[in-house]
Amino acid sequence: MFNVESVERVELCESLLTWIQTFNVDAPCQTAEDLTNGVVMSQVLQKIDPVYFDDNWLNRIKTEVGDNWRLKISNLKKILKGILDYNHEILGQQINDFTLPDVNLIGEHSDAAELGRMLQLILGCAVNCEQKQEYIQAIMMMEESVQHVVMTAIQELMSKESPVSAGHDAYVDLDRQLKKTTEELNEALSAKEEIAQRCHELDMQVAALQEEKSSLLAENQILMERLNQSDSIEDPNSPAGRRHLQLQTQLEQLQEETFRLEAAKDDYRIRCEELEKEISELRQQNDELTTLADEAQSLKDEIDVLRHSSDKVSKLEGQVESYKKKLEDLGDLRRQVKLLEEKNTMYMQNTVSLEEELRKANAARGQLETYKRQVVELQNRLSDESKKADKLDFEYKRLKEKVDGLQKEKDRLRTERDSLKETIEELRCVQAQEGQLTTQGLMPLGSQESSDSLAAEIVTPEIREKLIRLQHENKMLKLNQEDSDNEKIALLQSLLDDANLRKNELETENRLVNQRLLEVQSQVEELQKSLQDQGSKAEDSVLLKKKLEEHLEKLHEANNELQKKRAIIEDLEPRFNNSSLRIEELQEALRKKEEEMKQMEERYKKYLEKAKSVIRTLDPKQNQGAAPEIQALKNQLQERDRLFHSLEKEYEKTKSQRDMEEKYIVSAWYNMGMTLHKKAAEDRLASTGSGQSFLARQRQATSTRRSYPGHVQPATAR
């Protein structure tokens, strides 16, 4: 293996500088100092791979650095990092045991040795990229000394490179690689045939030239004999001398052409030998690829088998998950059964308490109806008494007016005040009586004795379920009835209070209007009497007429007010009638609800008696004959237990089978990976042989990188 340490670093730097000049970049690159700022290197890298080293990366390299060595070092660090990342990410290689260039020495002192190492890394990127054939051809066109140094640097760099990773599944690309190799082999064979044809043509040309040469030699000999016989050929003026010069020049031309054809023949022979070697190498590679293809096919079959087994494993896992869900549902059902049993006992206790409350509510409902009737009677009596009181007040005031006419106005105000006070007191009495009635209606009645609890007697689940349903139904009906009764009672109470209040107001206004009307009528009567008594007096007639007109106006105003009050009363009467109709409808609905409650209570009592009779008949001696439903429930529980145990056994079996299949898959995958890794290592060792040419090793390295894109990382790369 070559070692670049035998070559002077200065010579390496100069040779690589000559190679850099072949890229024709914009920046000057005549001396080593021109490369220390990193601008030329960045432009060269962009030409090598413009996709990876794009304009964004190039813009990070500062062009105007001048003599600032810090900016130079910054540019060189960016370039070195880009080269290493390109080798790792794009080329899939990692440089080991290679001394990286010291960018500080390059930037500060323009060190040629470190600059040569940097250019050597750029050279490695060029000969390993996708356009490597161009750059290798450019190297071949350079001088032999420069070419030798560059080739030595390439081989040293290649000896330090190692692939980052090799693929465990390389057999995926073997078919494609085999087709490509077959195409290259066919191209090489066609090129060989063309070269052989060309060699044959050149041999024919050489034979023809040799025959021509022999004929010319014979002719020359004849001419020499003639020359000896004739004049001296040294005289150029003589015809023989001129002919001699002409033949001599023609002979020299033929000799040069012969030498040129022989050199071309040797070159073609060497090229033919190289192509034969390449054909043999390609055949060997073809054989290796066919073996790899067979191995890949066998591995594909194994993978199909493993995939089928993995599908079975996934199905079994799905079944196990469904069994787990069923087991969880079974546990939930058991917990629900326990909760329902607890609720059953609680509902039975609530049933007894609700029966007691129902009895109390029935008793309170009867008392409430009696109180309502008493309230209506008292209101009627109150209205009658108020009318009588109004009449008595009116008579009292009339007599008092006759006695004392001067204090008429004062007495009238006093009577009005007294009447208002009486009305307020009456209203207060009515409100106090109504409040007392409502409080008496809502007072709790005496509690009765609770019925016997049946929690200890209920045994079977069906009886418990029936009782639970009945209790829930009873509870919902009671709640609905209580809510509806409370709402209706509150609504009726509010409507009744509003109606009573409005009625009292209207009665008060009506009473006042009647009093005013009676007063006006009495005044009219008095005026008429006084007019009849004093009809003879002419001077008082005008005054009497005025008084009469005033009293008539007052009477008219009172009649108008009375008509307005009557209209208001007539407007309010339909509302009062509607509210009374609504109250009657609500009372009728309440009565229907009470009848429904009675029916529900009767049904509940029947069900309760039936449950008690069933419980009494459940004697322990007759359980087997009289309780087939209990036996059916027991059978169902036993069947569920058996199903549970069978599911557990099947789950354990599938779990052990899945564990074994996972172990088999892991072992097969490990063996396949080891085989491919060993094969890749042998290929790499075979590709580094010293007997092959540089171009052959380059092709093998490229095919290895394409075939094994990478999962296994060698120990040197770690």
Curated annotation (Swiss-Prot):
Q: Which residues form a coiled coil?
A: 168-433, 462-663
Renumbered to this chain, region (Disordered) spans: 682-718
User: What do the Gene Ontology cellular component annotations say?
Assistant: centriolar satellite; centrosome; cis-Golgi network; cytoplasm; FHF complex; HOPS complex; microtubule; pericentriolar material
Q: Which CDD domains match?
A: HkD_Hook3 (cd22226)
Its chief place of residence is: cytoplasm
List all Polar residues biased stretches: 687-706
Which residue stretches belong to region Sufficient for interaction with IIGP1?
Answer: 450-671
Outline the segment boundaries, as ranges, of region: Sufficient for interaction with microtubules. Answer: 1-164
The places in or outside the cell where this protein is found are: Cytoplasm, Cytoskeleton; Golgi apparatus
- Positions where Phosphoserine occurs in the chain: S6, S238, S693, S707
Q: Which UniProt keywords apply?
A: Acetylation, Coiled coil, Cytoplasm, Cytoskeleton, Golgi apparatus, Microtubule, Phosphoprotein, Protein transport, Transport
One MF annotation (Gene Ontology) recorded for this entry: microtubule binding
> Which tissues is this chain's protein expressed in?
Expressed in brain, cerebellum, heart, intestine, kidney, liver, lung, skeletal muscle, spleen and stomach (at protein level).
Q: Which of the residues bear the PTM N-acetylmethionine?
A: M1
Pfam families in the record: HOOK, HOOK_N
Q: List the disulfide bonds.
A: none
Q: Does the keyword Methyltransferase belong to this entry?
A: no
Q: Which residues lie within the region annotated Required for association with Golgi?
A: 553-718
Family according to the record: Belongs to the hook family.
What does the UniProt function comment say about this protein? Answer: Acts as an adapter protein linking the dynein motor complex to various cargos and converts dynein from a non-processive to a highly processive motor in the presence of dynactin. Facilitates the interaction between dynein and dynactin and activates dynein processivity (the ability to move along a microtubule for a long distance without falling off the track). Predominantly recruits 2 dyneins, which increases both the force and speed of the microtubule motor. Component of the FTS/Hook/FHIP complex (FHF complex). (Microbial infection) Serves as a target for the spiC protein from Salmonella typhimurium, which inactivates it, leading to a strong alteration in cellular trafficking.
Q: Which PANTHER family match?
A: HOOK PROTEINS, PROTEIN HOOK HOMOLOG 3
Q: Cite the record's note on assembly.
A: Self-associates. Component of the FTS/Hook/FHIP complex (FHF complex), composed of AKTIP/FTS, FHIP1B, and one or more members of the Hook family of proteins HOOK1, HOOK2, and HOOK3. May interact directly with AKTIP/FTS, HOOK1 and HOOK2. Associates with several subunits of the homotypic vesicular sorting complex (the HOPS complex) including VPS16 and VPS41; these interactions may be indirect. Interacts with IIGP1. Interacts with MSR1, and this association is stimulated by ligand binding to MSR1. Interacts with microtubules. (Microbial infection) Interacts with Salmonella typhimurium spiC.
Q: What is this protein called?
A: Protein Hook homolog 3
Q: Origin organism of this chain?
A: Mus musculus (Mouse)
The gene name reads Hook3
